[in-house]
Swiss-Prot record:
Domain of life: Viruses
Compartments, as annotated in UniProt: Host cytoplasm
Molecular function per GO: ATP hydrolysis activity; magnesium ion binding; nucleotide binding; RNA binding
Cytoplasm listed as a keyword: no
Organism of origin: Rotavirus A (strain RVA/Human/United States/DS-1/1976/G2P1B[4])
Function: Plays an essential role in the viral genome replication. Participates, together with NSP2, in the formation of viral factories (viroplasms), which are large inclusions in the host cytoplasm where replication intermediates are assembled and viral RNA replication takes place. Orchestrates the recruitment of viroplasmic proteins such as capsid proteins to these factories. Participates in the selective exclusion of host proteins from stress granules (SG) and P bodies (PB). Also participates in the sequestration of these remodeled organelles in viral factories.
List of residues that carry Phosphoserine: 67, 154, 156, 164, 166
Lineage, broadest ranks: Viruses, Riboviria, Orthornavirae, Duplornaviricota, Resentoviricetes
Compositionally biased residues, Polar residues: 91-100
The protein's name in its UniProt record: Non-structural protein 5
Length: 198
């Protein structure tokens, strides 16, 4: 009996999504102008900015980040400060705030670039074969050795020593001696046969 399954290929799945959102905000945390680009996942940058401005600085935590991925998440601290209505929540790494001024704005450029492409191809082969094991079991029975049968009897009068011999410590008139030597000879023959078979 043979069973064979071949899977030569599966349909490939590919999709690409490209979206670019950018907005510029200003911050007055540091005294120098820095241009940076942050990537995040958000359906609407303007809606996210309004949501963040509507919250109290004490209520802003890591869960308000647009993404939990360290590479694309915002650097929002639990003690984030709000600078002004135009700047929104500060993304600067400094935890200390500085009085607002008209100089030294940090330029924040938020952009979203997302692309997904998935291609899967599977090549596999499964083969199962079975054979009958009855023939092997029959062959094993043919080579089975037949060893000489050893007969043993329960305690009878011929196997029990006389009471008179128990005091001497030696077997002078022992009815069991003849049976013992016959049994020992048979055991020796069985042992020799086993050694030859091995």
């Amino acid at each position: 009996m043979s069973l064979s399954i071949d899977v030569t290929g599966l349909p490939s799945i590919s999709s690409s999504v490209y979206k670019n959102e950018s907005s510029s905000t200003t911050s007055t945390i540091s005294g120098k102008s820095i241009g940076r680009s942050e990537q995040y996942i958000s359906p609407d940058a303007e809606a996210f900015r309004k949501y963040m401005l509507s919250k109290s600085p004490e209520d802003i935590g890591p869960s308000d980040s647009a993404s939990n991925d360290p590479l694309t998440s915002f650097s929002i601290r639990s003690n984030a400060v709000k600078t002004n209505a135009d700047a929104g929540v500060s993304m600067d790494s400094s935890a200390q705030s500085r009085p607002s001024s008209d100089i030294g704005y940090d330029q924040m450029d938020f952009s979203l670039n997302k692309g997904i492409k998935f291609d899967a191809t599977v090549d596999s082969s499964i083969s199962i074969s079975t054979t009958s094991k009855k023939e092997k079991s029959k062959n094993k029975n043919k080579y089975k050795k037949c060893y000489p049968k050893i007969e043993a009897e329960s305690d009878s009068d011929d196997y029990i020593l006389d009471d008179s011999d128990s005091d001497d410590g030696k077997c002078k008139n022992c009815k069991y001696k003849k049976k013992y030597f016959a049994l020992r000879l048979r055991m020796k023959q069985v042992a020799m046969q086993l050694i030859k078979d091995l």
